[in-house]
Amino acid sequence: MLRLSSICLILSFITLLAEEGPHWAFIKPNRHKLPTVKQTDWPINPIDYFILSKLENANLKPSPAADRITLLRRVHLDLIGLPPTPGEVKSFLNDKSPDAYKKIVNNLLASPHYGERWGRHWLDAARYADSDGYSHDAPRVMWQYRDWVIGAINSDMPFTQFVIEQLAGDMLPSATTAQRIATGFHRNTQINTEGGVDKEQFRVDSIFDRIATTGEVMFGLTFGCIQCHDHKFDPFPHVEYYQMFAFFNQSDEPRVEAPTQEENKRRDEHNEKVVDLNARVKASKAKAPERKKLETELAKLKKTRPRATTALVMQQRKSPRVTKRFIQGDFTRPSEVVQAGTPSVLHVFPKNKDPNRLDFARWVASPNNPLLARVTVNRMWQRYFGKGIVETENDFGTQGTLPSHPKLLDWLATEFAKVGWSPKSMHRLIVTSATYTQSSNARADAKEVDPLNILLARQERLRLDAEIIRDAALASSGLLSQKMGGPGVYPPQPPGCMNLGQHRKTWKASSGEDRYRRAIYTYRWRATPHPALKVFDTPDAFSCSTKRLRSNTPLQALTLLNDPAFMEISKGLARRVIENKSSDKERVIYGFQLCLSRDPDKREVFILEDFLRRQQSSFETAPNETKTLLGAQDPLPNIKASQHAAWIMLARVLLNTDEAITRE
């Protein structure tokens, strides 16, 4: 029994909440006026007024702009995930026009590499992988969805359309193959192929995963707990969870043909042969044995029709299922029947006799949705500054953190809608702001007032994501393949890694340019992800991931030094600097430019030249070690084997520097 005083306290708390009204995140964002600032010469675009206003209130000033080389490297890594080439750095430094930086930004947004960089962020949230998960972790064909994401981002598909096609592209009028492939977003759930699996339990668990992912990605909310009971903190009743469940409960999960251009070409050629042979059979006046031979040949040809790549998609059922609420989330304890619906605390769901998944998708993408734009621009902001305006980027509920700049968040959300939900427009706006272009150097005055840099008196220094560390190294070495799309590839990895799961898998390293593709194309096993990516905190794809963690361990340095792929990259970098420059000093400077985008200072040149001499001397007395390090490489003309080996060691040093794996 509660004491009377406790009951009164609870009732007072409930009354207080009622008086406060709806939680801020559940109210449609307003477009606030730009605040007045004192330092009027600093803002470049509206973002800066909101940031500067908060800084001035705290008696802080923004940091100076980053130097041009730092800024160029930063925006390259942020927008396309690759460092600028020495030629691009030189061209930018020589361009004195006032719009030089804006031209760089526009070129990067137009690059196909932009979709690869920002597609990786989305694939994390979509829990994309090339295997089923669970202990069997069988392979699956999902790369068509990955390529769809990259293509949609490169084409600057309006974000609302991007959302609708992934939630219900199969239900759009005259849905294309691409729109059906888009529904792979919710086929990224794990598939349990173990013996003794209860198929209905697995099907229900998949829907639970889809609701949880939709909640986190589209709403920045945690719906998992209302699977079993009313939300303890947010106004989401248990029954409303199963109203959303009803939308996904009407879907089948087929595998459909999604032929590539090359496969369509082979099929067309095959069909032409069938038509030609069929005509010959009909026109034949040959005797029975010869005619029979032609007919047999035709039958064989029809059976050998080239196969097409398949894709996992969503498809609406012809016969609807009845949806019931599960007591405490237990599918074996169904309760009352529920109809499809949406959380009542959010924007109104249009009245429809038989609402379906497409209606739900359009409701999610509605301009009246108070969360979609806020959550999306907040995640964009997070990628550029290390944390979002709302730091709990996947919890906009009452237990999440309050926005550090609430008026800026709302302004960005309304701006996103105003520019037609164009992600490229928002990226352009953010990276051309004075806020983004600040130096990341720490300042004592700002650290004292704002130790976590919440007010953004400077930029943030961030370690690169796992995939970008590999991609940047490949680009520096000159080995990076520009090939896009297609099935996953298998870059080298240490032996024995595939023995770690319950069932051994094979990993035959790719050859040719597939060996040096961007990491987004690396085959992604859930149970045994590529170790060089995992050690740098790539998510495991078992569930939705909207923010990368950043650890700092000795294993990371050892990976950059000794991983088979990075050894090949080091050899490629060494060969590149040797072949392109003649003196040691020129080669040191060139290697620095390739890896760090800048020239070394005199002290750095001295240290590296001294290291090079000591390494060469060591290899001259150890011919077997030299031979082992060089491996099967073609010898370089006019250079000793010991000197070549020393350059490989220096390349390993450059790729292992903190600066090489950091975005300033």
Question: Where would I find each of the regions flagged by the language model?
Answer:
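Bacterial N-terminal signal peptides
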Residues: 5-15
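Post-cleavage N-terminal segment of exported redox proteins
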Residues: 17-35, 155, 160-207, 250-254, ...
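Electrostatic cytochrome c docking/interface patches
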Residues: 36, 202-215, 283-284, 289, ...
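Primarily short, surface-exposed interaction patches in extracytoplasmic proteins
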Residues: 39-73, 78, 82-113, 127-174, ...
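Sequence context surrounding c-type heme c attachment/ligation sites in exported
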Residues: 171-272, 533, 545
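A structural supersecondary motif
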Residues: 523-526, 534-544
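Short, surface-exposed polybasic-aromatic patches that bind anionic ligands, especially phosphate groups
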Residues: 650
